[in-house]
């Protein structure tokens, strides 16, 4: 009888130890880097909500779980998150729904550029990973986010594998791009046009992907430098890389293709040589190249165009 009681005590002790061990594992934190520096956040959190499309792209690439997404027109790359029965809306990128957050009780909130002003308020509901990508070395910041998210989800090796693949594809595109002459990033928006050069929000096109900028110095501005059709003929780049903002946000309006179909543009080298690339607007504008899926799709489009 004494032996049976002892065995029961031992088993009970083991059960308690396992329970405590599991609780400790669930409560464990991990140190990662985000836009603020080093932060301590939950390891393998049970409930994660996301206010950044680039972060959604990263999580999808890693095979991680998400429990709340912004009420936002999602690009084809993120179509899986349109099912509200699986991924309830938690407000917009600019205006989080705090009542929904209160009900979901997330263990981690991931937020970025468009939600930056709300991060202090969001942090009242759960720890926040800030994946904002600012000016400067954008690719390094994107790699930082991939490493942080993959570490939090407990799959750092997957994050490193994604980075290695991206590095290889960038090198291949850069080698092609440097043989193509000059290129100019052009955004169309409501019938108006603006261009972006090195140092702008689309700096990666030049400094990472290897497209050679035109000689004309372009004003660095959030909304780009407003230009005319005459400007396009004057600078006359070998390639025009066109981003249709109306298409990116799903707004009705004259398409970029229609806007550029005129005599002045017809006289440019880019038109004559069929060197106009209509970029994946959602990947460039909504996701800002900030996730592995968007990056790889954009690299493939450039590689295919430069390889013609």
Regions found by a protein language model. Give the residues of each.
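Basic- and aromatic-lined ligand-binding clefts that recognize polyanionic substrates
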Residues: 47-51, 55-59, 158-212, 222
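Boundary at the C-terminal end of the N-terminal hydrophobic targeting segment
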Residues: 25-29
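Proline-aspartate-enriched helix->loop->beta-strand connector
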Residues: 102-111, 127, 232, 236-241
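Extracytoplasmic substrate-binding proteins
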Residues: 38, 121-190, 275, 284-308
